């Protein structure tokens, strides 16, 4: 299983960053490996989404259940679990924690592919791809959050 975690202080309000990550349909506009994104069903706290990922000549589609939570102390959470596709297991969590200078962003992801070959291929790019994803979200925040 591959794992990654990232923590950073960003100069934006938690709700603004939460809204950015919750806007799954916009991912193809700024995530380098996301070729398509579609919402299958949604309500205020849960989305079933379909993403098409292209990386190093491979294209894979998967569905996820994405759930948001706002805690009593103002922490915004987005939890994602893959429900179909090439993952034996995928879980990620975004936490947006109020901070004196904006938001403490915490991101966690761990996953395992169903194919050993895919697992090895993705594994060799996993850290780089995840870091690029975080940077893409940060760049998007600079562009769209006022």
UniProtKB/Swiss-Prot annotation:
Alphabetical GO biological process terms: cellular respiration
InterPro entries, per the entry: COQ10-like, COQ10_START, START-like_dom_sf
Gene Ontology molecular function, alphabetical: ubiquinone binding
Family recorded in the similarity comment: Belongs to the ribosome association toxin RatA family.
Role this protein plays: Toxic component of a type II toxin-antitoxin (TA) system. Binds to 50S ribosomal subunits, preventing them from associating with 30S subunits to form 70S ribosomes. Its antitoxin is unknown.
Highest taxon, organism lineage: Bacteria
Positions of disulphide bridges: none
Protein name: Ribosome association toxin RatA
Gene: ratA
Pfam families attached to this UniProt entry: Polyketide_cyc (PF03364)
Alphabetical UniProt keywords: Toxin-antitoxin system
Cited PANTHER family: COENZYME Q-BINDING PROTEIN COQ10, MITOCHONDRIAL, SPERM PROTEIN HOMOLOG
């Amino acid at each position: 299983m591959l794992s990654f975690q990232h923590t950073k202080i960003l100069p934006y309000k938690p709700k603004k960053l939460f809204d950015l990550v919750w806007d799954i349909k916009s991912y193809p506009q700024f995530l380098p490996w996301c070729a398509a994104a579609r919402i299958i069903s949604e309500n205020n706290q849960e989305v079933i989404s379909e993403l098409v990922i292209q990386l190093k000549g491979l294209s894979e589609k998967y569905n996820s259940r994405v759930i948001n939570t706002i805690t009593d102390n103002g922490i915004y959470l987005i939890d994602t679990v893959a429900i179909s596709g090439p993952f034996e297991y995928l879980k990620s969590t975004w936490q947006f924690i109020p901070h004196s200078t904006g938001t403490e962003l915490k991101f966690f992801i761990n996953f395992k592919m169903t194919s050993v070959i895919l697992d090895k291929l993705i594994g060799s790019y996993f850290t780089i791809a995840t870091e690029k994803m975080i940077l893409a979200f940060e760049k998007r925040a600079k562009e769209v959050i006022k």
